[in-house]
UniProtKB/Swiss-Prot annotation:
<feature type="domain" description="VHS">
    <location>
        <begin position="16"/>
        <end position="147"/>
    </location>
</feature>
<keyword id="KW-0863">Zinc-finger</keyword>
<dbReference type="InterPro" id="IPR008942">
    <property type="entry name" value="ENTH_VHS"/>
</dbReference>
<dbReference type="InterPro" id="IPR017073">
    <property type="entry name" value="HGS/VPS27"/>
</dbReference>
<dbReference type="Pfam" id="PF01363">
    <property type="entry name" value="FYVE"/>
</dbReference>
<dbReference type="GO" id="GO:0043130">
    <property type="term" value="F:ubiquitin binding"/>
</dbReference>
<dbReference type="InterPro" id="IPR049425">
    <property type="entry name" value="Vps27_GAT-like"/>
</dbReference>
<feature type="compositionally biased region" description="Pro residues">
    <location>
        <begin position="648"/>
        <end position="658"/>
    </location>
</feature>
<keyword id="KW-0862">Zinc</keyword>
<dbReference type="InterPro" id="IPR000306">
    <property type="entry name" value="Znf_FYVE"/>
</dbReference>
<feature type="compositionally biased region" description="Polar residues">
    <location>
        <begin position="335"/>
        <end position="350"/>
    </location>
</feature>
<dbReference type="Pfam" id="PF21356">
    <property type="entry name" value="Vps27_GAT-like"/>
</dbReference>
<feature type="region of interest" description="Disordered">
    <location>
        <begin position="323"/>
        <end position="357"/>
    </location>
</feature>
<feature type="domain" description="UIM 2">
    <location>
        <begin position="307"/>
        <end position="326"/>
    </location>
</feature>
<feature type="region of interest" description="Disordered">
    <location>
        <begin position="568"/>
        <end position="703"/>
    </location>
</feature>
<dbReference type="GO" id="GO:0043328">
    <property type="term" value="P:protein transport to vacuole involved in ubiquitin-dependent protein catabolic process via the multivesicular body sorting pathway"/>
</dbReference>
<dbReference type="GO" id="GO:0008270">
    <property type="term" value="F:zinc ion binding"/>
</dbReference>
Length: 703
């Protein structure tokens, strides 16, 4: 407690001394700020001391106090900034500005407004100092006239301060537990806790505002002392090549800042990259001087070392000049040799240069990566570190010159990317078309392969005017018998699902026969006694296709009706010219216009017609039913009277099982019905024959 009171009295005395004169004592102000930053005095006590000094009625004292406060704000550390940005201090300034009894001096008021504006501009984006900005905006709203704004960086308020102390039960270096005999000691540089053996060194810490020697641990002591001796201990070419330049260009912080945030290796790499960028990537032999090989002198002779450094500088400069001259001569000789010996290669070698002019060199790429690494390191360092490292600024300028080249390289890369995307889309389209073609070929191959195992419908090369008939009938009866004798066929028969137009000749045939159907004699079948030669069967071959030519009226009847009883495996139907007796003239006279009717024999595949006919067997067929088959196959009319016209009901019969019928009619086939009374297409409804009923009854009576 005694130490606190003594420190408070010390800060009060120093503040009073610094603000007693009308002239600003910069040295004393910096000493006070270092005392606050080193935490030699409590920041709240320092703030209250400055606040009491501002309440003095003397304007000169008020102005000096304001200047001292500004110096302490910029160098006192974050812990003091928090006290200045508190309501206690800022509200006191506002109350001084709004004093009504004794008006504030104009100079003091202007200085106070200027400082509030500067602090608010520098504290932007910091939540712990947000009240300064609120006060500034409130004064603006109340109509206070502030001076013109000046751009102030936030790093103005940044200053290094001793870290907060860290507590632990063991030494953070040797891990020895603390006890009554082994006491704790905090390092003033890093804030960690160590025992007496690991923190026996003492050093002043001017970068933290601590000017007297304080306790530090062995690690911080080695780090701080090695950084002070690092330029003389480096042995690489960067150290002895640019030793004097580095010493003069590096901006060391006040008092020799030790915690720069960069390691020696990183500094060395930064210097080497800058040198390589300046030399444009050229390399050459660097002869080492003899002075480097000499052992270092004792540090007790500074004058001799300075003389040796001067000699070393002269030797290095001479070697550098020789190296540059050697490189220039070598480059000129290489250029002349390449131009004289290989003239033909100049054009091909010069061609890629414009193409690769936008590409980054390895040195430039390395500089970009190094700059990115340095910027990442700066994220974990105090904001003022970037101002103390001129190498970062130089590297930023060198990288900024690469923006056009980098933009062009990026544009070229994007154009290549777009081209590759277009090519990929085209390849995808080609692959899709190729897959579709393979699928079509595969499906066609499967279709051709399945033709040998299942009846696949196909276009017939010949026109067909006959209706579909079943290939086989149960019990040895063919589809032809069922056509003539089954009266259930007309009810169960289904028309083709897809109608197709009939060829023109069939339509003409239909018109011709249809016009004659009304004049046909009812006694066409009135001569059942005419003998018919049974020598030639109607089904001659399994796969033969015949197209009989039009013949006379005597060839209008089929050969042998008994041939229908045999098993008819093939599905073709055609007529053969029958052998008619010479005395068959009544039949010829009954059909006078028959030679005009054309015959078209074509194979018909019979499928898809389930039926159960009740027709009798083929041997029971009367002889007068044979001539009806000579005109072609015809669907049974749905009228029962019309069905009696073609065939009477048999006395006995066995019902046939349903027989499937496949292969629908295709466009290549011409399906039609040819009957003694007319020809009807497959897709048109059946027209009943036009002969009157009485002739039919007379013919049945005659039978």
């Amino acid at each position: 407690m005694a130490g606190w009171f003594s420190s408070t009295s010390t800060i009060e005395d120093q503040v009073e001394k610094a603000t007693a004169s009308s002239l600003e004592d910069i040295a004393l102000n910096l000493e006070i700020s270092d005392l606050i930053r080193s935490k030699g005095v409590q920041p709240k006590d320092a703030m209250r001391c400055l606040k009491r000094r501002l309440e003095n009625k003397n304007p000169n004292i008020q102005l000096a106090t304001l200047k001292l406060t500004d110096t302490c704000v910029k160098n006192g550390g974050t812990h003091f900034l928090a006290e200045i940005a508190s309501r206690e201090f800022m509200d006191n300034l506002v109350s001084l500005l709004k004093t009504e009894g004794a008006p504030l001096n104009s100079d003091v008021k202007a200085k106070m407004l200027e400082l509030i504006q500067d602090w608010a501009m520098a504290a932007q984006g910091r939540m712990d100092l947000s009240y300064v900005g609120e006060t500034y905006r409130r004064l603006q709203d109340e109509g206070f006239r502030f001076p013109p704004k000046t751009q102030i960086s936030g790093s103005m308020l940044e200053s290094s301060a001793p870290p907060e102390w860290i507590d632990s039960d063991v030494c953070m270096r040797c891990r020895t537990p603390f006890s009554f005999m082994n006491r704790k000691h905090h390092c003033r540089n890093c804030g960690s806790v160590f025992d007496a053996q690991c923190s026996s060194k003492s050093l002043p810490l001017p970068h933290l505002g601590i000017l007297q020697p304080v306790r530090v641990d062995d690690g911080c002591y080695a780090k701080l002392t090695s950084k002070a001796l690092a330029p003389s201990g480096l042995s690489d070419r960067a150290s002895f090549k640019n030793n004097s330049i580095t010493k003069s260009s590096v901006m060391e912080p006040r008092g020799g800042r030790a915690e720069g945030g960069f390691d020696d290796d990183l500094r060395r790499a930064l210097q080497m990259s800058l040198e390589e960028a300046q030399n444009k990537g050229s390399s050459g032999y660097v002869p080492q001087s003899t002075a480097v090989q000499q052992p270092p002198r004792a540090p007790a002779q500074p004058a001799i070392e300075e003389e040796e450094d001067a000699d070393l500088k002269a030797a290095i400069e001479a070697s550098l000049r020789d190296m540059e001259e050697h490189k220039q001569k070598h480059a000129a000789a290489l250029k002349n040799t390449s131009s004289a010996d290989i003239p033909s290669r100049q054009t091909p070698s010069a061609t890629p240069l414009p193409k690769n002019s936008y590409e980054l060199s390895p040195v430039e790429v390395e500089n970009i990566h190094l700059f990115a690494a340095l910027v990442d390191r700066l994220q974990h360092q105090p904001p003022g570190t970037i101002l103390r490292e001129p190498q970062i600024q130089e590297l930023y300028e060198s990288i900024g010159a690469l923006r056009p080249k980098l933009a062009r390289s990026y544009g070229e890369t994007m154009s290549k990317h777009d081209t590759l995307l277009d090519l990929h889309a085209k390849l995808s389209t080609v692959v899709r078309y190729y897959d579709r073609m393979l699928e079509e070929r595969l499906s066609s191959a499967y279709a051709q392969h399945s033709l040998g195992y299942s009846p696949v419908p196909g276009g017939s090369p010949y026109p067909n005017i006959y209706p579909p008939m079943p290939a086989h009938a149960p019990d040895g009866k063919t589809g032809t018998e069922s056509f003539y004798y089954g009266n259930a066929i007309a009810e169960s028969h289904q028309a083709p699902t897809t109608p197709y137009p009939q060829p023109q000749p069939e339509r003409e045939l239909h018109e011709r026969v249809g016009t004659r159907s009304g004049t046909m004699s009812p006694g066409v079948y009135a001569h059942p006694s005419q003998p018919i030669s049974p020598t030639v069967p109607w089904n001659g071959s399994a796969h033969a296709v015949a197209s009989p030519q039009p013949s006379s009226a005597s060839m209008a009847y089929p050969s042998n009706p008994s041939a229908y009883a045999g098993p008819a495996a093939p599905t073709q139907f055609y007529t053969s010219p029958p052998h008619v007796e010479p005395d068959s003239k009544p039949a010829q006279h009954a059909r006078p216009m028959e030679p005009d009717m054309p015959y078209q024999g074509s194979p018909v595949m019979q499928r898809e017609t389930p039926y159960q006919p009740t027709a009798p067997s083929a041997p029971d067929l009367p002889a007068d039913q044979g001539p009806a088959s000579g005109y072609g196959l015809q669907r049974q009319p749905t009228d029962p009277s019309a069905a009696l016209y073609y065939a009477p009901q048999p006395p006995q019969g066995t019902p046939y099982p349903a027989y499937p019928q496949g292969a629908p009619v295709h466009p290549g086939q011409a399906v039609g019905d040819v009957s003694p009374v007319g020809v009807t297409p497959a897709h048109a409804p059946y027209q009943q024959p036009t002969p009157s009923r009485p002739p039919v009854e007379e013919s049945l009576i005659e039978l």
